[in-house]
From Swiss-Prot:
This is Small ribosomal subunit protein bS20. GO terms for cellular component: cytosol; small ribosomal subunit. Residues 1-22 are annotated as: Disordered. Keywords: Ribonucleoprotein, Ribosomal protein, RNA-binding, rRNA-binding. Gene3D superfamilies: Ribosomal protein S20. GO terms for biological process: translation. GO terms for molecular function: small ribosomal subunit rRNA binding; structural constituent of ribosome.
Length: 95
């Protein structure tokens, strides 16, 4: 247990940040999972909508300092590839 007043406050701040970061990361995982599920089911409109929401949330997490910008870029490109593949599957299936 800290005795110094500033360290007590710092511990409290760190705990609040940890909980916020955990919630944001959990929501990111959920949104990415939605994109993957929609892509797997060949549901293009749902996949594109989920991709848009996930990209916004990833950018917001970067601006808040929750994740590194490169990690967000890697995740965005990965789910974007899935949506593009879904778009190609749907366009060739219609022919």
């Amino acid at each position: 247990m800290a005795n110094i007043k500033s360290q007590i406050k710092r511990n409290r701040t760190n705990e609040n940040n940890r909980l916020r970061n955990k919630a944001v990361k959990s929501e990111l995982k959920t949104l990415i999972r939605l994109v993957k599920r929609a892509a797997r089911d060949n549901d293009l409109p749902r996949a594109e909508d989920a991709l848009r929401r996930a990209s916004l949330k990833l950018d917001r997490a970067v601006s808040k300092g929750v994740i590194h910008p490169n990690q967000a870029a890697n995740r965005k490109s990965g789910i974007a590839k899935l949506v593009v593949a879904t778009r190609l599957r749907n366009s060739t299936a219609g022919e």
